[in-house]
Amino acid sequence: SCWIAETMDWKTLARDEYNGLKLGIIISIGYAPEKIPLKQEGIRTAIRLRTKKPAQIMTANGQPTEPEQMPEWFNRGINAVLACPTAINKLPVVFDLTDGVVSASMPNQRHLVQDYDLGISKLHFELASNLKGTWELGQPGRFIVSE
């Protein structure tokens, strides 16, 4: 998948509104052609060169922690987040595990597409951790596990 927001050339769209809702992000799914434009190649390279480590985007009870001290399902979620694209490709999200409850936030981030970045990261975490439930909107959004 590819999540496109701030790098999108909005003038190329046939329409950017639907039923009164303004389009804010585009998600493309599929395989890229063998030869891709230089701009896309640069974005792809930036994602591959991200150097964040799991400990940089995880906390336990609000304090820094290491993967070895976290449950396996949590680490699977974190690893998926580290591999996923985001709208601005900076991965500014932090996942916390406090008393068995996961929350996600983007401390000190103020950009136009931060809610998209947070949602993309939440989705990848949820899918990889294999938890069933729903995320609260906003920050910090807690994950409510389904019974």
Region locations from a protein language model:
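Acidic, surface-exposed loops and disordered segments
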Residues: 1-147
